[in-house]
């Protein structure tokens, strides 16, 4: 499945957070949602990305819900979140179901399947923006989308 484009309907999903609660996309309609997919907790690139979202959280807070999604399990997510004092929730997608629905679970350059680092801005159930995973690039897109 290709990566979802702007204007596409965002697939509804329910996933568990690093704290064991469940989050359902369709229940988050009160403000936009920034949903960023990343490959793996506590790896160099993913740690940088998550810390950028952490550091930009005050800019996002009033404007959007922010969630990171990776295949890591809840215990790994919780340890990663605690280690870096992440101030947003991490969602666990161990079977890559949601990543596949959004089109970000695909073959990579090395010939193996994995997550293509992608951030979506979702407004009223639609993809309002799609950006690279860097927090400072995404934040401006919330107002624009």
Where are these regions (language model features)?
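Chalcogenol-based redox active-site neighborhoods
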Residues: 1-145
């Amino acid at each position: 499945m290709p990566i979802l484009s702007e204007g596409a309907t965002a697939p509804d999903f329910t996933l568990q957070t690093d704290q064991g609660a469940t989050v359902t996309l369709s229940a988050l309609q009160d403000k936009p949602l920034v949903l960023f997919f990343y490959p793996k907790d506590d790896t160099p690139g993913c740690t940088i990305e998550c810390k950028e979202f952490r550091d930009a959280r005050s800019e996002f807070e009033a404007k959007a819900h922010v969630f990171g999604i990776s295949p890591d399990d809840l215990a790994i997510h919780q340890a990663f979140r605690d280690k870096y004092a992440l101030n947003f929730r991490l969602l666990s997608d161990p079977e890559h179901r949601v990543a596949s629905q959004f089109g970000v679970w695909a073959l990579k350059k090395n010939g193996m399947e994995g997550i293509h680092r992608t951030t979506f801005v979702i407004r009223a159930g639609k993809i309002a923006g799609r950006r690279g995973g860097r927090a400072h690039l995404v934040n401006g897109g919330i107002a624009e989308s």
